[in-house]
């Protein structure tokens, strides 16, 4: 059974090297576990959608909760799915500082990434729009 999980967290280290390390690790490990998804980052906040088998997604989320590179990890949305929305990416990436602010303002009060202040469904809609507007990089 496929599931989709959406969570937010705050980055402990916001350097480009730290973010690249997370992406590189994900792109190596995720194919082995049948995991796909995207990671958005901006303003020290991560918003990530992960898709795959129920056990694989649950195990990965448990690992993320214990990962010292993340703090304030919050589950935003979880659902069983019939097909993947982010199946083309072992871990796509979106640097929110490079996104047109009008996209962010469509889903939030301020032009910044803050999944803590909106519903999980709104955050998922933002990710879907970023995918539709080809804002996701790192297809692997």
What label would you give each PLM region?
Residues 1-140:
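Charge-rich, low-complexity N-terminal segments
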């Amino acid at each position: 059974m496929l599931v989709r999980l959406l969570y937010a967290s705050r980055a402990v280290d916001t350097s480009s090297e730290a973010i690249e390390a997370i992406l590189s690790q994900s792109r190596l490990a995720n194919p082995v576990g049948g995991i796909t998804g995207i990671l958005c980052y901006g303003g020290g906040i991560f918003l990530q959608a992960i898709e795959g088998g129920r056990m694989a997604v649950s195990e990965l989320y448990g690992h993320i909760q214990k990962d010292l590179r993340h703090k304030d990890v919050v589950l935003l949305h979880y659902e069983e799915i019939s097909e993947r929305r982010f199946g083309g990416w072992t871990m796509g990436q979106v640097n929110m500082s490079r996104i047109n602010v009008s996209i962010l303002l469509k889903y939030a009060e301020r032009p910044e990434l803050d999944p803590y202040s909106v519903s999980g469904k709104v955050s998922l809609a933002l990710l879907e729009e970023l995918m539709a507007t080809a804002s996701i990089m790192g297809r692997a």
